[in-house]
Design a protein with these regions (language model features):
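Hydrophobic residues in beta-strands and at strand termini
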Residues: 51-53, 97, 144
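Short beta-strand micro-motifs enriched in acidic
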Residues: 40-42, 112-116
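HotDog/MaoC-like acyl-thioester-processing domains
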Residues: 1-16, 101-103, 114-150
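Hydrophobic beta-strand-centered segment that forms part of the acyl-chain substrate-binding groove
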Residues: 75-113, 142
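A conserved, well-ordered hydrophobic junction motif at loop->secondary-structure transitions
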Residues: 48-72
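Beta-strand secondary-structure signal
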Residues: 48-50, 94, 108-110, 123-125, ...
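Non-catalytic linker/capping segments at the edges of enzyme domains
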Residues: 1-55
Length: 150
């Protein structure tokens, strides 16, 4: 159990360091970008967040704007990589909306690194669930430019 806690702590420390050094101006690093959004790692390196969006993030009546959902997914993927000590940029983001994400209802996002195709290309996956049902599934490709010092 101590090893798992140490692993989670390692991911959290890496994320905090990378956010300060490479991501300080990101709107998702300021509080509150989305009210209550707080990412945490599990011992396997998956990033998990729980939050709610109110009317200020609404698109169609009663639904969270799809662009807000995509931005949250993008931020979670970037921060998941930072927790793995990787600074990379979004090259491709594919978002599949399976059902509406409703306002004023708890939302859970889980993001994981699927694979690394090289030291410069990373594949990630995110799932957003609401009421224990999958609402949004996304995949992303992130590229680490050769010019970034990590």
């Amino acid at each position: 159990m101590e090893k798992k806690a140490a692993k989670r702590e390692m991911f959290e420390k890496r994320l905090a360091l990378r956010k300060r050094s490479h991501h300080a101006g990101c709107m998702f690093n300021r509080q509150p970008a989305v009210s209550g959004l707080n990412f945490r790692f599990d011992d396997s390196g998956k990033l998990r967040g729980e939050f709610e969006c109110g009317k200020e993030r609404q698109g169609y009546d009663g639904m969270v704007h799809g662009g807000v959902v995509a931005a949250i997914i993008d931020a979670s993927m970037a921060q998941c990589l930072m927790g793995h000590d990787i600074v990379a940029y979004t090259a491709d983001l594919s978002v599949r909306y399976r059902r509406p994400v409703t306002i004023d209802t708890p939302i859970v996002i889980i993001t994981s690194v699927l694979q690394s195709r090289s030291e410069y290309l990373y594949m990630l996956e995110s799932e957003i669930c609401q009421n224990a049902e999958l609402a949004v599934k996304a995949t992303g490709k992130f590229v680490r430019p050769k010019l970034i010092a990590v």
